């Protein structure tokens, strides 16, 4: 076995067929690895399959029986109030995120899902990926804002699409999705959600930082 960056051939190829797709699209270094092969080994006009991807980061609510509040959100457990523990809350991404492939975790998205990044491996470069994404969602499905769910879609051709969406019953089962947790806030129909995701390294979700502002029915969360 050899890593793709160490692969050398006598002549260029017509096709790059890969499965470098991470659970959250970028976490298996798909972009730098495939771009390296493309620039070194693919003939002009050659094909990359799959080459078209969408990255999603959607505000969502969880099923009640799957919701696990932060300990400082528990203010009446048999008379005990743990809210003071917020002063000691950890801010590392590992504590504030979780990974699952269970279709029973996410109840619904709060807004209409739209891709926040589209990737075309025929043209993308690693340096062209944004390190800050800001976008808004209008609440059309009210509920508790539990966090942001990160997933991807891969468009193989006009007839075949692969998804890691937590709401897709036909999703590729071996791919997970990532939940970026937030303090719980109740949202109402018509509320505006303002999301910002900052990234140092797309391949390392522990470098991601996120906020979500709720306007019209809540407070700023981070």
Label for each model-derived stretch:
Residues 2-198, 202-222:
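Class I SAM-binding transferase module
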């Amino acid at each position: 076995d050899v890593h793709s960056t160490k692969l050398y051939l006598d002549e260029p190829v017509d096709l790059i067929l890969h499965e470098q797709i991470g659970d959250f699209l970028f976490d298996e270094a798909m972009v730098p690895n495939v771009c390296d092969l493309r620039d070194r080994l693919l003939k002009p006009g050659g094909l990359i399959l799959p080459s078209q991807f969408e990255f999603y980061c959607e505000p969502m609510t969880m099923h009640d029986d799957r919701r696990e509040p932060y300990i400082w959100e528990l203010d009446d457990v048999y008379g005990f109030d743990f809210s003071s523990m917020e002063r000691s809350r950890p801010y590392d991404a590992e504590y504030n995120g979780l990974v699952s492939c269970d279709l029973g975790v996410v109840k619904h998205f709060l807004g209409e899902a739209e891709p926040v990044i589209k990737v075309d491996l025929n043209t993308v470069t690693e340096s062209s990926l944004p390190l800050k994404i800001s976008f808004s969602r209008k609440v059309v499905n009210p509920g508790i804002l539990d966090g942001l769910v990160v997933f991807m879609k891969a468009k193989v051709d006009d007839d075949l699409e692969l998804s890691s969406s937590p709401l897709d019953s036909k999703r590729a089962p071996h791919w997970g999705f990532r939940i970026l947790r937030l303090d719980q806030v109740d949202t109402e129909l018509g509320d505006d959600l303002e999301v910002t995701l900052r990234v140092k390294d797309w391949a390392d979700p522990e470098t991601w930082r996120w906020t979500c502002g709720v306007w019209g029915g809540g407070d700023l969360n981070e």
